[in-house]
């Protein structure tokens, strides 16, 4: 009888745990929690142990970069931070399409799932939008909003195109821990920074603080270019410089396989077809990596494949089923549905507009 009671108790505990996990999954689906929170093991909560290895499951071919990004995010947990100072100032640089943004997003997602961040949300500021002194008010409003937005990461893009005066403000945030404002500002009911004019007003804002956020700069250039724009004191305040590497052929093959697997799932869920592709198709997709686009060329190729197959499905009102096989020929990719004769895949796509 006691055994039966204990068994029922155990079943009750398991049911409660599963209900709790399901609630977490629902919150993930609604965007209230980072993906992966429900499946995080208890021993991983609050820990960086094995975090880089987990990121490398989805971020392929950039192992050293992932290690350096995780190290950069961990640094303030080891060194500690003071007050509203920046948690860490980080430069992520490398060629386009080498996974800089994806690696940061995955690191933040897993950190949030482990309770190391409150959320994986990031505020992004495109500094190219502030090229001259006339954009000062807009810059200060956007900077203040980003630093007070939900999440603990503020990302800065295209610092190379920003007005030097605004870069000095960012430098002050990193070096001095706050930046003084030349005019008196107030925060209105909507949380927007507005000029207070000449009148003395309660609650005036005279400086901007980093609010304990990670300040992360993206660039295609390294430390020297950063010093040219911001100065040596700013570069000295940068805690970590993380650089991506060119993809090896093996890494590109793995990335292509990952993209094709995702494509197969999409084709199955959207078009109701089973997609098959051999090593030659994987190599064809891998070869779409270019100096200009990097690995984005692989994603673009898979998007074209999906659009071409969608066009094929749209040519008939009957619901198609079965297997569509992709093959690579010297002239390009070919497809065959249920063993039919292979046909050119990309000829299904509408002709590009040329303006003629």
Which role fits each region the language model picked out?
Residues 119-150:
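Short glycine-rich substrate-engagement loop in P-loop NTPases that contacts/grips substrate
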Residues 86-88, 148, 182-220:
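AAA+/SF3 P-loop NTPase mechanochemical coupling elements
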Residues 45-88, 307-314:
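Pre-Walker A (pre-P-loop) alpha-helix and adjacent loop at the N terminus of AAA/AAA+ ATPase modules
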Residues 56-60, 98, 161, 280-300:
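A short helix-loop-helix "switch/interaction" segment in the helical subdomain of ASCE P-loop NTPases
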Residues 82-120:
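Walker A/P-loop
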């Amino acid at each position: 009888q006691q055994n039966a009671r204990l068994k029922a108790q155990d079943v009750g505990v398991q049911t409660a745990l599963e209900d709790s996990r399901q609630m977490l999954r629902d919150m993930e689906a609604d965007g209230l929690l980072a993906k992966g929170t429900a499946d995080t093991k208890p021993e991983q909560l609050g820990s960086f142990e094995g975090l880089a290895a987990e990121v490398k499951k989805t971020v392929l071919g950039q192992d050293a970069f992932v290690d350096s990004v995780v190290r950069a995010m961990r640094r303030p947990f080891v060194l500690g931070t003071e007050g509203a100072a920046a948690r860490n100032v980080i430069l992520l640089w490398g060629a386009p399409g080498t996974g800089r943004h994806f690696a940061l997003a995955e690191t933040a997602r897993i950190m949030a799932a482990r309770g190391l961040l409150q959320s994986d949300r990031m505020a992004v500021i495109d500094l190219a939008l502030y090229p001259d002194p006339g954009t000062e008010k807009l810059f200060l409003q956007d900077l203040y909003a980003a630093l007070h937005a939900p999440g603990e990461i503020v990302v800065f893009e295209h610092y190379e195109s920003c007005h030097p005066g605004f870069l000095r403000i960012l430098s002050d945030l990193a070096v001095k821990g706050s930046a003084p404002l030349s005019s008196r500002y107030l925060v209105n009911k909507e949380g927007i920074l507005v000029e207070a004019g000449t009148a003395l007003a309660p609650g005036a804002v005279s400086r901007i603080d980093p609010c304990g956020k990670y300040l992360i700069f993206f660039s295609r250039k390294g430390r020297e270019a950063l010093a040219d724009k911001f100065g040596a004191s700013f570069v000295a305040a940068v805690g970590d410089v993380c650089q991506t590497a060119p993809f090896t052929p093996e890494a590109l093959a793995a990335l292509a396989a990952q993209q094709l697997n995702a494509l197969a799932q999409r084709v199955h869920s959207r078009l109701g077809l089973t997609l098959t592709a051999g090593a030659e198709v994987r190599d064809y997709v891998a070869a779409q990596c270019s100096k200009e686009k990097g690995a984005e060329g692989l994603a673009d190729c898979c998007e074209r494949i999906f659009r071409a197959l969608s066009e094929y499905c749209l040519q008939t009102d009957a619901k198609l089923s079965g297997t569509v096989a992709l093959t690579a020929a010297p002239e390009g990719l070919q497809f065959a549905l249920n063993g039919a004769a292979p046909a050119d895949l990309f000829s299904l796509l509408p002709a590009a507009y040329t303006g003629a």
